[in-house]
Every structure is written in C-alpha cells, then in structure tokens.
A protein has these predicted regions:
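Short, low-complexity disordered leader/linker segments with a strong preference
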Residues: 1-44, 69, 73
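Hydrophobic alpha-helical segments within soluble ligand-binding/sensing domains
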Residues: 38, 135-176, 275-293
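Extracytoplasmic "Venus flytrap"
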Residues: 44-70, 81-90, 184-186, 237-238
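An alpha-beta-alpha
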Residues: 45, 63, 152-200
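Structural motif
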Residues: 79-101, 209-225
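Beta-alpha junction/loop-to-helix N-cap segments that form part of ligand/metal-binding clefts
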Residues: 85-142, 236-251, 255-260
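Pocket-lining segment of extracytoplasmic ligand-binding domains
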Residues: 180, 186-255, 261
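Small-residue-rich helix-loop
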Residues: 266-268
C-alpha cells in the first residue's frame, strides 16, 4: 500500500505532559541559590545530552528556560556545565566523571544512554533524566511510583499501539510494518517489542531494519522501502539524527513514515502521537528546582 502523491502531510501530535516520576526523598540538598534577595553561591548543574538533534536540543533549551522561570539564572545564581555525549558511551562516562569531580549539585541526563552513563558514576548526586522511554527496563529506577536511589526524571513513552491506531486511521489496510530503529538504544528495544505484540495480535507482519549509527540509516530505509506498506520508528535518537535521509527514501517510494516525536514530523515524518518536548523540558526543570529547594 503506497501513500497517495497528493496526500497532505499530517501532524497529529498529542500534547502530553511528561510522566513525572516521584521525587526522591533523599534528593533534596542545601539550597545555594539566592533566596529572598540573599546572595549565596550559585548552584551548579551538569547537563549531559546523548547527542545534538532537534528533540533533545528542545528539551535542554526548555529545561534552562524553566529553571530561569523558577528563579535560577545562568551567570547569576546558576552555573551550567553542558556536555554533548556525541552518542559515544566513552565520551558520556568521561563527562559524567567530570560532573562528579566538579561537585555538581544536580546532574541532568537527556536520553537513556546518557542517564545510564551518569548513574554508573554516582549514587550520591541527584540525577534527573529526561526523554527516557522505559526507565525501569533501562535499569534507572525500581518503579515509576517510587524510583529509589538517587534517580528520578521524566519519561517520553508513547506506545506502538497508539501509533498503529493512528496509522490505521490515516492509511488503513496495511499488512507489513517496517521497523526502523537503533539496536543499541534500550528505549527503542522496548517499543519494538510492544510493536511485535500488537502485530501478532492483529495478524500483521513486522519487518525489522536495525542500525548501529546514523550513517546506516539510509541503507536501512532502502532495505524496507520495497518490502513494507508503512514504516514506524520509535523515539530513537539515532534515527532522529538522520531523518533527512530516511524521509528522502520513503518519500521517493511513497511509503508512509510514522514516528514518535513531534520534531521527527517536523523533519519529514508523516504523523505521530507524541510528546511535546517543550513541555517535557519544563516538567524536568520543575523537578530539578524542587530538588534544589530541598
């Protein structure tokens, strides 16, 4: 089943509040930012982002904006050390060590591998993650209600079933679903497992094309293009960073490409029910502010 050439590009973004996990009882610390006009030393926050791409950048920018709204301003009572993880675990672990040695009050980790890297380096400094699809499966928290340890954060989980229901509304009658994702991202693995369960229950076929880095996305997309009716990609940072090449392939073959983030639609995907990453960033910043305030 091919998408009609005159089909208008659709954006079906569900404006969802991020799932804010319970704050840790032990995460509060002595407030060091100015309070009531009293000058004290700035609070120090480390931000580790998996890689640079629109979704993650939006989260980081919204976190900083949210902290400013909460009264924490860079150059005044807030010091921010931002590190780009370059999608490399060695780089991320080095950055996490830098945060620990530098005495950060809170560490913010954007995306699953970044959070895992930070957690491997400290069990004392409060860690607030953002854009982690499956915090339990990733080994970050014990439960969503009571995270445990020094970790809390916001989740961007969107079930594959929701996206498939959307696909059935827009492009009904598909039988073969292409799954384009990174084999190295735990967040993608859990969603693809959900997709397979949905497919089995609905007599549909899933054809997988997994990548290990963004340079493989074009070839993976070409592999799927002549085998499937639609393609689905979860909230996958590797695919998100290479949306231009993926959408070029699928547009040429007129294959509907469903994604799981609003920014991925803006970068060429057909449609999504997804997280508003500006809202998620603000929710994350609110959690950080509460920790700083003790």
């Amino acid at each position: 089943m091919k998408m009609k050439t005159n089909m208008k590009k659709l954006l079906a973004v569900l404006m969802m509040l991020a799932l804010a996990l319970g704050l840790l009882a032990g995460c509060g610390g002595e407030k060091t930012a100015s309070e009531g006009g009293n000058e004290t030393k700035p609070v120090k926050i480390g931000i580790l982002q998996l890689m640079e791409h629109p979704s993650l950048n939006t989260i980081r920018e919204s976190i900083i904006e949210g902290l400013t709204e909460a009264g924490y301003t860079e150059g005044d009572n807030l010091e921010v050390d931002y590190q780009n993880g370059q999608n490399d675990m060695t780089v991320m672990k080095t950055a996490a060590q830098k945060f620990v040695e530098g005495g950060c009050d809170v560490i913010i980790a954007i995306a699953t591998p970044a959070a895992q890297a930070v957690l491997s380096e400290t069990t004392d400094i409060p860690i607030v993650f953002a854009a982690v699809t499956d915090p339990i499966g990733a080994g970050l928290v014990d439960s969503l209600e009571v995270p445990g340890g020094n970790v809390t954060g916001t989740s961007d989980e969107v079930s594959a079933e929701m996206i498939m229901n959307l696909a059935e509304e827009i492009t009904p009658g598909f039988q073969k679903i292409g799954a384009l994702y990174s084999s190295g991202e735990d967040n993608s693995a859990s969603v693809i497992a959900n997709l397979k369960e949905y497919a089995a229950a609905n007599d549909l076929e899933v054809i997988e094309s997994a990548v290990t880095n963004s340079s493989e996305v074009q070839q993976a997309a070409q592999y799927l293009a002549d085998k499937v009716d639609i393609v689905y990609s979860p909230i996958d940072n590797t695919v998100a960073s290479a949306m231009a090449v993926a959408t070029e392939v699928f547009n040429e073959q007129k294959i509907p490409f469903y994604v799981s983030a609003d920014s991925m639609v803006q970068d060429g995907g057909l449609a999504t029910y997804g997280i508003d990453y500006t809202v998620l960033g603000k929710e994350t910043s609110a959690m950080v502010a509460r920790i700083l305030e003790g």
